[in-house]
From Swiss-Prot:
InterPro entries linked: Rab-GAP-TBC_dom, Rab-GAP_TBC_sf, SGSM1/2_RBD
Residue numbers bearing the N-acetylalanine modification: A2
Record's keyword terms, sorted: Acetylation, Cytoplasm, GTPase activation, Phosphoprotein
Alphabetized Pfam families for the sequence: PH_RBD, RabGAP-TBC
Organism: Homo sapiens (Human)
Name by which UniProt lists this protein: TBC1 domain family member 15
Domain Rab-GAP TBC intervals: 346-556
Function, as annotated: Acts as a GTPase activating protein for RAB7A. Does not act on RAB4, RAB5 or RAB6.
């Protein structure tokens, strides 16, 4: 590897916002985020890959540091013998993928000698470059877990620090390198790309992929090839996915596309603002675009949604109220009214074990008690047949079944750190942990294509806690996974769609806030990834999650209500983020530090108020109507008069932060009723029924 000096040459690829998650050396529990620029250059018939800190005046004392147990890090030391070993150790680390979306805290790097490190030391420590002829392989992260990262391994077994592409597009780098070398998947690990040989013919024929007019423009210097390729890549996505078109419109991708056609001189071939507005209008239906004279800015004004209504919540549905709505054969009467009451106030804990089976679809709402008894017998037999499948596999068989072996390994690691502070799962050899493990292993037999993905234990834990029964917990979990399945698929299409939909809703509510996030490289809302992936499981206390999930399971007041919950949380934090001028790292840090500090009743009030505000809007964009499942500006809204009992206590929703310049305050009157004293948790966890 060559010294990381200044390199000149023809730039083939260039990407800013490529981070190294550095190590602190003597401080073993912290990691830093160093933003840099990655380039691929041609020089004297040699191809050079070069990374260096983005700011030439980099002062490592200003770097923010994260705990190592909460971020994805491949450590890089100066000793060559250690580099290969440590790199391999971290690459195979279970933490490296899941914890990319689990960063919880950052710290300033302390100086061991009391002096700030010099600019030269900080820069030379992390800058690197190498010739493509020295490249042995490229390790890719598992797709879907936050932003992508790549790790370069050289032929002398030196493993370079992982490069994290916070802004995406790591695939463009791979495509650029494939012009010069052949990259093939490793037979042992499909995420590892092996460098086989030089491939100059690919480079020579690359221009033929473009049509002749475009090639002529490139040769004449009127068209930036890199920008054109970027535009073509994303234009294909626009045609395939209208939601992607919406997101790209929000990100002002059109400026970049048309800039590639204008050439390097911004004063020539300037596209009229009116045409840009027309393009964005098509890409973002329902939003009005105003072009300002100031170049480079498009102001997308939000539609006047009108006054936001005041929302009230009620007490949790009691066992007595539930019983009154059951007929002599055990059928639930007036299901819609029951769902409305649950949405308004949740359920008392004594009722959850029974009601959750209906909310999750395990029991049909119109089933009789006898039919449910028969169903449970059938499901019990089915469960144990599947459980026997993995229980009966011998060690010799498992040695030849790498997928099952990998599933078991992930499950064991996840189970051992899932809700261990909860009395239900604390201690060694806890029956709750054993059941958690067995249910997840059985789910691998139930859906072997999906198997187990990190994070699924977070979804199962509250279900097992409430059901206290292995079979019932499994089938409730299977039903919940039917809803959440796309979140955990390898392509992560469900997560991508939700992030795009969330951006659409947030821009409608406050385009100014969205523009600020975009200016801080946070426009794709990746800091909400964990919220969506496991439905806020790590953002609220365990008891609050029980309340939040049962409210969401009613599917009221609209489709994708969880996205409005995200909007409500971001709305509450908007003022602090903008007034303190938070950048990318500060936004990520701030959002993660909200964990366990969010008032669930306050957020439910705000989210419902937002939904009612949108329903009453006569100019609601069609894209938003589709996201929320609204037809003709109509939605199934919970009746404010639900609960005829005069003793029902209603709590007012705090004023929206969008409607006031003051920081939002949590209402003391909105106290939750599911305090630890009201939800009995027996110290004798052996009351679980493993069946």
């Amino acid at each position: 590897m060559a010294a990381a000096g200044v390199v000149s040459g023809k730039i083939i690829y260039e990407q800013e916002g490529v981070y190294i998650h550095s190590s602190c050396g003597k401080t073993n529990d912290q990691d830093g985020l160093i933003s840099g620029i990655l380039r691929v250059l041609e020089k004297d018939a040699e191809v050079i890959v070069d990374w260096r800190p983005l700011d030439d005046a980099l002062d490592s004392s200003s770097i923010l540091y994260a705990r190592k147990d909460s971020s994805s890090v491949v450590e890089w030391t100066q000793a060559p013998k250690e580099r290969g070993h440590r790199g391999s150790e971290h690459l195979n680390s279970y933490e490296a993928e899941w914890d990319m979306v689990n960063t919880v805290s950052f710290k300033r790097k302390p100086h061991t000698n009391g002096d700030a490190p010099s600019h030269r030391n900080g820069k030379s420590k992390w800058s690197f470059l190498f010739s493509l002829t020295d490249l042995k392989s490229i390790k890719q992260n598992k797709e879907g877990m936050g932003w992508s990262y790549l790790v370069f391994c050289l032929k002398d077994d030196v493993v370079l620090p992982a490069l994290h592409f916070h802004q995406g597009d790591s695939k463009l780098l791979i495509e650029s390198l494939e012009k010069y070398v052949v990259l093939c998947e490793s037979p042992q690990d499909k995420r590892t790309l092996l460098v086989n040989c030089q491939n100059k013919s690919l480079s020579q024929s690359f221009e033929n992929l473009l049509d002749e007019p475009a090639y002529g423009l490139i040769q004449a210097g009127l068209l930036d090839r890199r920008k054109l390729l970027w535009a073509i890549h994303h234009w294909k996505k626009i045609k395939k996915d209208p939601y992607t078109a919406t997101m790209i419109g929000f990100s002002k991708v059109t400026n970049y596309i048309f800039d590639s056609l204008r050439g390097s001189d911004p004063s020539t071939h300037q596209r009229p603002p009116s045409e840009m507005a027309d393009f964005l209008s098509d890409a973002i239906p329902g939003l009005k675009i105003n072009q300002q004279e100031e170049p480079g800015f498009e102001v997308i004004t939000r539609i006047d949604l009108g006054e936001r209504p005041v929302v009230q919540r009620r007490e949790p549905v009691s066992l007595e109220e539930w019983t009154k709505n059951i007929d002599s054969e055990g059928r639930i009467l007036n299901v819609d009214n029951m769902k409305q009451m649950i949405f308004r106030g949740g359920l008392s804990h004594a009722l959850r074990k029974q009601a959750w089976k209906f909310l999750l679809g395990y029991f049909p709402w119109d089933s009789t008690k006898e039919e449910r008894t028969q169903l449970q017998k059938q499901k019990t037999d089915e469960y144990f047949r599947m459980k026997l499948q993995w229980k009966s596999i011998s060690q010799e068989q498992e040695k030849r079944n790498s997928r099952l072996r990998d599933y078991r390994s992930l499950i064991e690691k996840d189970v051992n750190r899932t809700d261990r502070t909860n009395k239900f799962y604390e201690g060694q050899d806890n029956p709750g942990l054993i059941l958690l493990h067995d249910i997840l292993m059985t789910y691998c037999m139930y859906d072997f294509d999906l198997g187990y993905v990190q994070g699924m234990s977070d979804l199962l834990s509250p279900l097992l806690y409430v059901m206290e029964n292995e079979v019932d917990a499994f089938w409730c979990f299977a039903s919940y996974m039917d809803q959440m399945h796309q979140n955990f698929e390898e392509q992560m299409q469900g997560m991508k769609t939700q992030l795009i939909q969330l951006s659409t809703l947030l821009r409608l509510l406050d385009s100014g806030f969205c523009s600020y996030l975009e200016s801080q490289d946070s426009g794709y809302l990746y800091f909400c990834f964990r919220w969506l992936l496991i439905r806020f499981k790590r953002e609220f206390s365990f008891l609050d999650i029980l309340r939040l999930w049962e409210v969401m399971w009613t599917e009221l007041p609209c489709t994708n209500f969880h996205l409005l919950l995200c909007c409500a949380i971001l709305e509450s934090e908007k003022q602090q983020i903008m007034e303190k001028h938070y950048g990318f790292n500060e936004i990520l840090k701030h959002i993660n530090e909200l964990s366990m500090k969010i008032d669930v009743e306050d957020i439910l009030c705000k989210a419902e108020a937002i939904s009612l505000q949108m329903v009453k809007c006569k100019e609601l964009p069609q894209a938003v109507c589709e996201i929320l499942g609204l037809q003709g500006s109509e939605v199934t809204t919970p009746d404010s008069d639900v609960g005829e009992d005069e003793n029902v206590v209603m709590t007012p929703c705090p004023t929206s932060a969008f409607q006031s310049n003051a920081l939002p305050t949590l209402s003391a009157s909105g106290a939750r009723n599911d305090s630890p004293t009201q939800i009995p948790v027996s110290s004798d966890v052996c009351r679980l029924t493993p069946a």
